[in-house]
């Protein structure tokens, strides 16, 4: 019988766990989620969540999204290889229904799992966005 728990060993806990994934990750995205992932040396997948107050203003909505993501991961972890995943949310997610978010997450678990397999093409590096607060001194 499958083990459907979501214990401490299935979570990313320390800043070093997160920073390892941010260095050349495999990426997958939908309109409301971005997943970053890297293979790990554990015997199970692990999940880290980042739901920024800047993206989702109300605490009850941030908590709803985190509960939903943990539950969806817990039910799908047996289909995911040994990879570490960081889930980030985008603006506008708090207006979506639970069913829509679950559908997107289920699709993303499959997509990121394929992109982390050995032999999968490496993604291009992140492109740094220009800082919006710096004003251009360009003269016309």
From Swiss-Prot:
Task: List the catalytic activities from the record.
Answer: Endonucleolytic cleavage of RNA, removing 5'-extranucleotides from tRNA precursor
State which Enzyme Commission number(s) the record gives: 3.1.26.5
Q: Which NCBIfam families match?
A: rnpA
Listed name of the protein: Ribonuclease P protein component
The role this protein plays is: RNaseP catalyzes the removal of the 5'-leader sequence from pre-tRNA to produce the mature 5'-terminus. It can also cleave other RNA substrates such as 4.5S RNA. The protein component plays an auxiliary but essential role in vivo by binding to the 5'-leader sequence and broadening the substrate specificity of the ribozyme.
Could you name the domain of life of the organism this protein comes from? Bacteria
Give the main EC class. hydrolase
Membership in a protein family: Belongs to the RnpA family.
* Keywords on record: Endonuclease, Hydrolase, Nuclease, RNA-binding, tRNA processing
Q: Name one GO biological process term.
A: tRNA 5'-leader removal
- Give a GO cellular-component term: ribonuclease P complex
* Single annotated GO MF: tRNA binding
Assembly mode: Consists of a catalytic RNA component (M1 or rnpB) and a protein subunit.
- Organism name: Pseudoalteromonas translucida (strain TAC 125)
Start and end residues of each stretch annotated as Disordered: 115-140
């Amino acid at each position: 019988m499958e083990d459907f728990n979501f214990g401490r060993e299935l979570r990313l806990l320390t800043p070093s766990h997160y920073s390892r994934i941010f260095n050349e990750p495999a990426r997958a995205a939908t309109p409301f989620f971005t997943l970053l992932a890297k293979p790990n040396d554990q015997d199970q997948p692990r999940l880290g969540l980042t739901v920024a107050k800047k993206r989702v203003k109300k605490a009850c909505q941030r908590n709803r999204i985190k509960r939903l993501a943990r539950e969806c991961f817990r039910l799908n972890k047996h289909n995911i290889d040994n990879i570490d995943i960081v889930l980030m949310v985008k603006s506008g997610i708090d207006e979506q229904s639970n069913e829509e978010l679950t559908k997107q997450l289920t699709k993303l678990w499959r997509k990121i799992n394929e992109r982390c397999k050995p032999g999968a093409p490496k993604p291009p590096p992140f492109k740094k966005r220009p800082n919006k607060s710096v004003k251009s001194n360009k003269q016309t």
